[in-house]
Amino acid sequence: MIQDAFWGILIPFLGTSLGAGCVFFLKNALRDGIQRALTGFAAGVMVAASVWSLLIPAMEQAADLGRLAFFPAAVGFWLGILFLLLLDHLIPHLHQNSLQAEGPKSQLQRTTMMVLAVMLHNIPEGMAVGVVYAGYLAGTAQITAAGTLALSLGIAIQNFPEGAIISMPLRAEGMKKGRAFWGGVLSGIVEPIGAVLTILAAGIVLPALPYLLSFAAGAMLYVVVEELIPEMSQGQHSNLGTVFFAVGFSVMMALDVALG
């Protein structure tokens, strides 16, 4: 089980690293249409993962509360939203295709704030992977080895385009290929760190697992609504983003049902 958790935590990070490696093979920055499609796909995966892999298991684990089984999921969900809202105000960052940075005023370089934006985005994904593996290691009936693998694979699939989305613009900003690659890799390092910390926290307070599952869901959905949906809806390719949102949602849903 420990070995399963190790690889489950590492797989999403490998997805980001492989995506960042696109900077060595693609000469030009990603076209707007491709960026919209990749962003929409990532958003679809995250929404499906939030529902099938996090919120539903959270309510199933609280089934002994009867009609109040929704309560832990609702509380954790709102705490996740508020946590990301707080980070959004505390960390200076710059979203893709945005001219104005968010968060406190900072003298950080534009490229650094772009990496910070993706790192902020990746925090809830690492927490999501960590909390499902915490449930798996604890022997929770609602969380299976196949289900945890489905979530890891789904996050890894959507991390691949994210790695490219950060490394290619860094290259377009004038950064050398090697540094742009490591910038993409660095943006994903928070995921395994967040996963390990979440596993440790869940191990200490196992009865709070339903709250932690829904906390991760709330944090992920905050990122989708605040960042990904606006990015995929800009410009002339918004329909493409919507179509690939549906593709990403379907892929993650199929993975969870087929493997879970």
Language model: regions and residue ranges:
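Intrinsically disordered, metal-sensing/regulatory segments
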Residues: 1-260
